Amino acid sequence: MARFYRRRKFCRFTAENVAYIDYKDIDTLKQYITENGKIVPSRITGTKARYQRQLALAIKQARYLALIPYTDNHK
């Protein structure tokens, strides 16, 4: 039987040597938001705590400035 190994999580921001997560970088921020608009936790994404705090702040700033929606599904 074939065994499925879970891919090791790593922090993309550490690997790319990012100094600051910008709230205007919408494409990056959307990767860390669910389809309901919630911020994905670091235990799922593998983001380090320092960058997770910056990420949450950047997402909240972008939401406040209406760059990204609070929720995607309005039914």
Curated annotation (Swiss-Prot):
One of its GO terms (cellular component) is cytosolic small ribosomal subunit. It comes from the Bacteria. SUPFAM superfamilies: Ribosomal protein S18 (SSF46911). GO terms for biological process: translation. Keywords: Ribonucleoprotein, Ribosomal protein, RNA-binding, rRNA-binding. InterPro entries: Ribosomal_bS18 (IPR001648), Ribosomal_bS18_CS (IPR018275), Ribosomal_bS18_sf (IPR036870). One of its GO terms (molecular function) is small ribosomal subunit rRNA binding. The keyword RNA-binding applies. Binds as a heterodimer with protein bS6 to the central domain of the 16S rRNA, where it helps stabilize the platform of the 30S subunit. HAMAP family: Ribosomal_bS18. Part of the 30S ribosomal subunit. Forms a tight heterodimer with protein bS6. NCBIfam families: S18. Belongs to the bacterial ribosomal protein bS18 family. This is Small ribosomal subunit protein bS18. The lineage of its organism: Bacteria, Pseudomonadati, Pseudomonadota, Gammaproteobacteria, Moraxellales.
